[in-house]
Amino acid sequence: MEEKISNLGVCFFSGRMLYSVAEKGAKNIVQQLGSYEFSFDISEALNKPTSDAGIQLKAVFTDLEKEFHLECIRLLTEPTQECWTALPKVVYDDSIEREQHIAILMKGVPRENIEVTWHAVSKTRFKFLCLRRAQLIKNYQSFSDQVAINECCSDFEIGGMWSIHHRPGGSFLLIGCHARSISISSYILGRFRAATYIRFDDPQDISYLWLQHAEHSPWMRGLHEHVYFYGEQTHEVAKQLQSFIDHNSGQIVLNSLEIMGINAEEETYGFDLATAFPAIMLSLDLS
């Protein structure tokens, strides 16, 4: 019997690695969902693959590669490791001006050390720019020796996958809750509209910081039919933001397979499924 070819989706939340394995071509079925809890600092492992922590993390990927015939590994990158901004398309179209903006945004970082990706948005006169340090991507890719296709995806890209998978229609916000940041992505009629992220030291500051960011990003105050939350401490974040989100919006925490529209052999898990949501989306074939 021919071995099934699968995709692996991975994300990290506060000392835990969440993973999802789905058969190639699967739209709403996962083969396996799981998590690993580590005693070491995951950020150290990701930033220093040759450290003891990095070697232990790589061993986990090696075990998964042995267990499944993987064709593709997709990993979620943490928002604070990236720079996001929207720029007029005329900047994108002019190579000189484009490079000047990148140099300003990543001041002091040599151009060869910057990974640049441009994304289409609902307003065609703009482009959305995501910048990362190239070394970060090399670090992520170093955890797999066997799989040729190895992609790193941003929080705002998860919204596009959710839109294809769930087809919520209308408009929605997707809020990713991390230990020291939240990401906010807006979609309208299935198309990416805008995104930003908010850093914080104390979760109690989220509501104040939201108001501060909304002054410069008015789309955050716009009408959205649904607001989805995923990640860690989702209920706490939702509570902090309930006064600032349109009361007519349906607020949904993506913490069950039923809500996500996903089928799996197991129904209960020993971890919060809201933290596994990105890994699930990354494992599906949603192109």
Regions inferred by a protein language model and the residue ranges of each:
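Small-residue (GG/TT-enriched) beta-loop-alpha framework at ligand/catalytic clefts
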Residues: 2, 6-35, 119-223
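Glycine-rich phosphate-binding loops at beta-strand->alpha-helix junctions
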Residues: 225-250
